[in-house]
Amino acid sequence: MSKLTIVRGFNDVLPLDSYKWQFLESKVKLILDRYNYSETRLPIVERSELFHRSVGESSDIVSKETYDFQDRNGDSLTLRPEGTAGCVRMVIENNLATRGQTQKLWYCGPMFRYERPQKGRYRQFYQLGVEAYGFDGIAIDLEVIAIAWSLFKELGISEYVTLELNSLGSSLNRQEYTQALLQYLKPYHAELDEDSIKRLDKNPLRILDSKIEKTQKILANAPKLMDFIDHDLRLRFKQTCQYLDALGVRYKLNENLVRGLDYYTGLVFEWTTDKLGSQSAICAGGRYDGLVENLGGQKTAAIGFAIGMERLLLLLEDLGKLPNQDNACDVFFILDSAQLHQSLAIVENIRQELPQLKIDMDLKFGSFKSQFKKADKSGAKVAIIIGQDELDNGFAGIKFLQQNEEQQQVAFNELINFLER
């Protein structure tokens, strides 16, 4: 029989690593509570049509990377490759953005893309998503960027990340620019890299995102998207930059930042780092004011971003910003296996009364000698002995495992007071 192993591109989070996730998730919740965003939990499976209509048929994600399957009813379903589309579907289906309602939401969970696995890029990966609906003005753009900035500051990595900004303008602006870009690139067709040639027909704007040096040289003299953007949208982008200056948020302009999802309009942004090699983007987002309407809802202003949690953890680890793991328990009980009906009741009562304490015991209930060895290895400060003699006398034995103090006796009805000290 063959050995069962994990699927390529997927990862187990082992007990020794789970504390890193708990640390990061606690910081995420701290920041989002500060900005009064509400958590939502979304299904990992959606109808395939949702992503075809939102992410885009011609996008790399839909054309090459989704996990699609048919259920027993013959419906085409997809493991979600990103969270925004599902969040918009939920907002529409539950009438959360009608009649001028506003929503500030966040979610965190696994996404799935069939990509070549490498450091920082996996086939199952976790994303934090932050989405806001019903806000037209610049203030929400600034708030969403400030949320990411606040999280990076809370984690102690703000000096190692860079905010990159661009504006994609309106859909009409992009159509006009796309034609100008295609006209410019026509003489260079044979010199473009293979991926860029494929994108000429499907999604020409994505050529701007090419990392191939030869293609970048060709693009150096290409028409600039900003020159095709309406005056009011250019002014809005300029004002956004001015407000970021006032907030003290560092940024740089990136005219080639276009994002790989078709639904973005207006402001787009990424937070990047030079500490993770080729997987430099740890956060990306922007406005998607047309998506709610495109998916059947009312016309609704929208903006959001996603953070790759694994990449963020890699960065925290690389910079030494993760706390040390503390698996030590506070109290270790040494029990007589012949009297468990009494001693376990005492232990459970203490767990209920003092929930902040980490309490452990040897559930194999070996000899007292072997239990004391496990108590020493547990890192506990105190061992509490409850054997036959202790039960007969009404006192628990107290041994201090990390201090040179004599063993004490404490009455069972005083144990809680003793442990609270």
Swiss-Prot record:
The cellular component terms of Gene Ontology attached to this UniProt record, alphabetical and capped at eight, are: cytoplasm
Q: Which UniProt keywords apply?
A: Aminoacyl-tRNA synthetase, ATP-binding, Cytoplasm, Ligase, Nucleotide-binding, Protein biosynthesis
Gene Ontology biological process terms, A to Z: histidyl-tRNA aminoacylation
Question: Sorted alphabetically, which CDD domains does this protein's record hold?
Answer: HisRS-like_core
Q: Is Magnesium a UniProt keyword of this protein? A: no
Name the chemical reaction catalysed here: tRNA(His) + L-histidine + ATP = L-histidyl-tRNA(His) + AMP + diphosphate + H(+)
Q: PROSITE patterns, alphabetically?
A: AA_TRNA_LIGASE_II
**Nucleotidyltransferase among keywords:** no
Output the Gene Ontology terms for molecular function: ATP binding; histidine-tRNA ligase activity
Instruction: Please indicate which superkingdom the organism of origin belongs to.
Output: Bacteria
E.C. designation(s):
6.1.1.21
InterPro entries listed in its UniProt record:
aa-tRNA-synth_II (IPR006195), aa-tRNA-synth_II/BPL/LPL (IPR045864), Anticodon-bd (IPR004154), Anticodon-bd_dom_sf (IPR036621), His-tRNA-ligase (IPR015807), HisRS-like_core (IPR041715), HisRS/HisZ (IPR004516)
The enzyme's main class, written as a single word, is: ligase
Q: Where in or outside the cell?
A: Cytoplasm
Q: Which family does it belong to?
A: Belongs to the class-II aminoacyl-tRNA synthetase family.
Cite the record's note on assembly: Homodimer.
Q: Write down what this protein is called.
A: Histidine--tRNA ligase
What species was this sequence derived from?
A: Francisella tularensis subsp. novicida (strain U112)
